[in-house]
Amino acid sequence: MFIIELIKGIILGVVEGLTEFAPVSSTGHMILVDDMWLKSSEFLGSQSAFTFKIVIQLGSVFAAAWVFRERFLEILHIGKHKHVEGDNDQQRRSKPRRLNLLHVLVGMVPAGILGLLFDDFIEEHLFSVPTVMIGLFVGAIYMIIADKYSAKVKNPQTVDQISYFQAFVIGISQAVAMWPGFSRSGSTISTGVLMKLNHKAASDFTFIMAVPIMLAASGLSLLKHYQDIQIADIPFYILGFLAAFTVGLIAIKTFLHQINKIKLIPFAIYRIVLVIFIAILYFGFGIGKGI
């Protein structure tokens, strides 16, 4: 049984790594894979299972931090500054770097404030299967609207052309995505595209903005619940973290490489299919009724 439970922990880490930064809602997938299937709370205990999810989320966040490590060093003025994104080498040499620490802070403020004010309310009232399905569906529609709009935009902006106003509006959408199932990246990438950024630029800023706020949120949660960690459960935490980190690295790099080509609609369609699947399990078979 111990080996089977370790495998379950690895599976959850893989799911977290695949979905945390993709616009598909990691919350929706964790409900489907864990709460409806693997049920980590049964072999870890409810409190330890909650802490386990924080740890594997940190694995994904560290993966994003590693992918963007050079950009973070540049934003913090550590190390050598690289060229600015532009259409050609001459543009890159002539433009000063525009993305800076203030952009990131401006984007973090709305979610930070609302998180402090409503975190307990959201955790108590919105973490249910029906509310997550609503978030998945509404988020999918928003992504489709953004993609349809982006097709009309000529010369979309790069991440180094982002303004403080754009950063703030994208930050507001990150706060809206606190609704479970809506998806932080789905919301912020869509908003970035609606603000005339290209898909890659919107994705880059989404990840750069998300890393510090998620590190802070997950770190605080871990400090609150670290006493729930049992020595016997440490192998689950280690393997889950490593799985989330490794798969997260691959998923993030692949996503960033392909997003300008595939856009958001394929992810939106997937989300709608996921809603239908969860609805069948929940309403048709009663699976997850206790969540």
Swiss-Prot record:
Family to which the UniProt record says this protein belongs: Belongs to the UppP family.
Location of this chain's protein in the cell: Cell membrane
GO CC, alphabetical: plasma membrane
Pfam families registered for this protein in UniProt: BacA
Catalytically driven reaction(s): di-trans,octa-cis-undecaprenyl diphosphate + H2O = di-trans,octa-cis-undecaprenyl phosphate + phosphate + H(+)
Annotated protein name in UniProt: Undecaprenyl-diphosphatase
Keyword annotations of the record: Antibiotic resistance, Cell membrane, Cell shape, Cell wall biogenesis/degradation, Hydrolase, Membrane, Peptidoglycan synthesis, Transmembrane, Transmembrane helix
Main location: membrane
UniProt source species: Staphylococcus aureus (strain COL)
Note: Bacitracin is thought to be involved in the inhibition of peptidoglycan synthesis by sequestering undecaprenyl diphosphate, thereby reducing the pool of lipid carrier available.
Transmembrane segments: 1-21, 48-68, 102-122, 126-146, 162-182, 203-223, 231-251, 267-287
GO MF entries: undecaprenyl-diphosphatase activity
Enzyme Commission number: 3.6.1.27
Function description: Catalyzes the dephosphorylation of undecaprenyl diphosphate (UPP). Confers resistance to bacitracin.
Transmembrane as UniProt keyword: yes
Membrane topology, record value: Multi-pass membrane protein
Protein's GO biological process: cell wall organization; peptidoglycan biosynthetic process; regulation of cell shape; response to antibiotic
NCBIfam families according to UniProt: PRK00281.1-4 (NF001390), undec_PP_bacA (TIGR00753)
